[in-house]
Amino acid sequence: MADKQFNVVRRRGTATFPADDTTVVVTTTETNINGLHRWIEWETPNLEGTDSTKIEIRSPSGGTFFDSGTVAESTRFTQGTVFPLPGTVDVVVTVEGTQSAPQDITYDIYFTE
């Protein structure tokens, strides 16, 4: 039996939240992301006035492929699930609460081509 090789690709992105005192939703569009989603990792900083974040991967038409539910702040989170990626997706990150300074949430999407 021949060995199989999988081309695992990592797509790194950042969602930057402005200083704000309301719920903030940041959408980042990722293009040329064709293949099977394998897992997603993201890291949240110590956020002020909130205790959770949420990340979603959506199709351009608004359908949700992936929804993390709420995830604690100040953590690196990994969640795996397999679904097809159609080429262009929106990564939607939601944070609630007051931020006195801009904050970055970084994410890595891993998929096979």
Role assignments for model-derived ranges:
Residues 34-42, 83-104:
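Noncatalytic modules at the cell exterior or secretory-pathway interfaces
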Residues 1-4, 88, 112-113:
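Interface-prone segments of viral and bacterial extracellular assemblies
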Residues 102-113:
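Exposed low-complexity, polar/acidic, P/S/T/G-rich flexible segments that act as propeptides
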Residues 47-64:
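Short, surface-exposed beta-strand/strand-loop-strand elements in extracellular ectodomains
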Residues 12, 60-69:
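Local beta-strand/beta-hairpin segments that build beta-sheet-rich folds
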Residues 26-35, 80-85, 112:
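Extracellular and analogous surface-interaction loops
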Residues 66-85:
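Mid-chain, well-packed structural core segment of small domains
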Residues 1-31:
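Solvent-exposed, flexible loop/coil segments flanking beta-strands in beta-rich domains
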